[in-house]
């Protein structure tokens, strides 16, 4: 919204303090969340500009590849769009088809800039290269649109979501398939998953020892405390041992 500085301050002033901020956004949203982390919590991932990686082969529909690519590119000029294939012929046809389809796209300026700045075509030569490339990219969205998806599916460990087969376009997951769409970007799928209920729960450790329990393990803990020259720790443990 075109608010001036004073209006923005008024909006923030009237907002209640929160303990956690979650949700996707562009590069500015992701940057803002990073700056407030520590004062509040954020989800354990980077939910920044959108990404798609498409795995295609000689039997993949050219139209499906191109439309999935521009469907991601039109999100944001910072969107990342990657095609991975072994098929040189598909690459040649894809480049031409992409150019044609971009001409009629209402958001063609955004999509064109996205593809120019962040688009990539990876020509690979074997399945090992495919698997390694995907796991290294760790895309937010992965479309596996090949004739035999089973040989890849269980070897992909780093991806926010995986759309399998020709009838599972990424764009559908934006709206109607029911899976969570707040997903890790910027390769953060290597260490995190999509937003889930677990992000809204905290865990508290509860420790309860019996007299017998503290006597059994206290000796070991005391040795460690004394080794670290933490006399107070050792005294605290000893005060509970052999106490009548």
Task: Give, region by region, the residue ranges found by the protein language model.
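C-terminal core of ALDH-fold dehydrogenases
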Residues: 135-244
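ALDH superfamily catalytic-core signature
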Residues: 27-129
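Single conserved hydrophobic/aromatic residue that forms the stacking wall/gate
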Residues: 1-12
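Generic secondary-structure signature for well-ordered alpha-helical cores
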Residues: 13-14, 34-38, 57-61, 70-78, ...
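Short coil/turn connectors at secondary-structure junctions
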Residues: 6, 15-19, 24, 40-42, ...
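General beta-strand structural signal in soluble alpha/beta enzymes
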Residues: 6, 20-24, 30-31, 42-46, ...
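Flexible, glycine/charged-enriched surface loops at secondary-structure junctions
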Residues: 18, 79-84, 104-115, 145-146, ...
């Amino acid at each position: 919204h075109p608010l001036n500085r004073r209006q923005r301050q008024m909006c923030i002033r009237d907002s209640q303090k929160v303990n956690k901020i979650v949700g996707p956004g562009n590069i500015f949203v992701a940057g803002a969340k990073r700056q407030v982390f520590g004062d509040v919590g954020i989800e354990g991932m980077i939910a920044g500009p959108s990404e798609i990686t498409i795995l295609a082969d000689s039997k993949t529909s050219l139209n499906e590849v191109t439309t999935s690519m521009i469907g991601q590119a039109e999100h944001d000029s910072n969107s990342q769009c990657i095609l991975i294939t072994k098929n040189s012929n598909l690459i040649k046809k894809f480049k031409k088809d992409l150019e044609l389809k971009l001409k009629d796209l209402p958001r063609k300026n955004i999509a064109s800039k996205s593809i120019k700045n962040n688009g990539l075509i990876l020509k690979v030569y074997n399945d090992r290269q495919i698997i390694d490339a995907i796991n290294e990219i760790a895309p937010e969205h992965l479309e596996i649109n090949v004739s035999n998806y089973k040989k890849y599916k269980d070897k992909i460990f780093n991806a926010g979501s995986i759309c399998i087969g020709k009838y599972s376009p990424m764009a559908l997951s934006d709206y109607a398939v029911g899976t969570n769409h707040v997903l890790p970007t910027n390769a953060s799928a290597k260490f995190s998953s999509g937003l889930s209920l677990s992000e809204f729960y905290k865990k508290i450790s509860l420790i309860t020892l019996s007299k017998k329990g503290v006597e059994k393990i206290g000796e070991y803990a005391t040795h460690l405390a004394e080794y670290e020259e933490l006399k107070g720790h050792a005294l605290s443990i000893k005060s509970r041992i052999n106490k009548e």
